[in-house]
């Protein structure tokens, strides 16, 4: 687990085996702190923490001792005044870090450019913050076949391919990913990836060929035409019957 104040915590999943209807306490948070991300690990991963001011620290999770459910955790990263952690990623999630700033700029940087160090440090610069870029809003570990979604403060969403994003060095700003109106910023980012297994496992045995599709469309059009004629004939017959009833009712009124 990681909090915005740079605290990290590692707890065995077995500690959460018996969850009550009202839930279980997962972590004790310090004042003004909040949980930002949770990852399932194997106790062998390198962890990346990235802050809104463009700092990044990489350390191995073995540096984080395992603690109980209600513990606070330990310091993962020392932050400067006003800074906060915006994302936690693991090396197994991707070969690069995609970092996006609030004014719609972003870049990919190889994870290998970040040297592992002991937890609790200030990290290294991972993004050049300027007035043009704004602060960092999110980070995702990605591979070239991944796709990303960006959502703005106005609720606009775009989807981009990681392969179309520029691969840049550690101490650089990004390139334009989305055009934003004045006073609109990127609110959040997410990684999406096509599940090829769904396509591979799809049953295509009942799919029609191109000729069968044309034949089916022709039959459907002919049936629709017949239905239209039948409906017209039925309407004419119904109208004729109603007129006959009206004439009969008029005759009865005259006899009375």
Question: Where are these predicted regions, by residue range?
Answer:
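C-terminal interaction appendages of subunits in large macromolecular complexes
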Residues: 1-256
């Amino acid at each position: 687990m990681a909090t915005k104040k740079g605290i990290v915590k590692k707890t065995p999943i077995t500690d959460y085996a018996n969850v009550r209807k009202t839930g279980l306490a997962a972590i004790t948070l310090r004042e003004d702190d909040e949980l930002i991300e949770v990852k399932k690990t194997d106790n062998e991963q390198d962890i990346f923490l990235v802050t809104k001011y463009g700092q990044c620290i990489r350390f191995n999770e073995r540096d984080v001792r395992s603690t109980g459910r209600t513990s606070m955790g330990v310091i993962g990263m020392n932050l400067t005044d006003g800074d906060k952690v915006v994302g936690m990623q693991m090396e197994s999630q991707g070969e690069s870090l995609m970092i996006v700033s609030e004014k719609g700029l972003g870049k990919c940087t190889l994870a290998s450019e970040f040297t592992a160090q002991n937890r609790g440090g200030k990290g290294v610069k991972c993004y050049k913050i300027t007035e043009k870029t704004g602060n960092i809003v999110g980070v995702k570990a990605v591979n070239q076949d991944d796709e990303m979604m960006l959502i703005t403060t106005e609720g606009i969403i775009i989807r981009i391919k990681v392969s179309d994003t520029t691969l840049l060095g550690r101490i650089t700003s990004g390139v334009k990913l989305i055009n934003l109106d004045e006073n609109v910023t990127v609110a959040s980012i997410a990684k999406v990836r096509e599940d090829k297994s769904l396509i591979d496992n799809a049953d295509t045995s009942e799919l029609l060929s191109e000729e069968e599709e044309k034949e089916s469309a022709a039959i459907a059009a002919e049936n629709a035409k017949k239905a239209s004629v039948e409906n017209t004939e039925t309407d004419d017959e119904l109208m004729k019957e109603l007129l006959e009833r009206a004439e009969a009712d008029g005759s009865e009124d005259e006899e009375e």
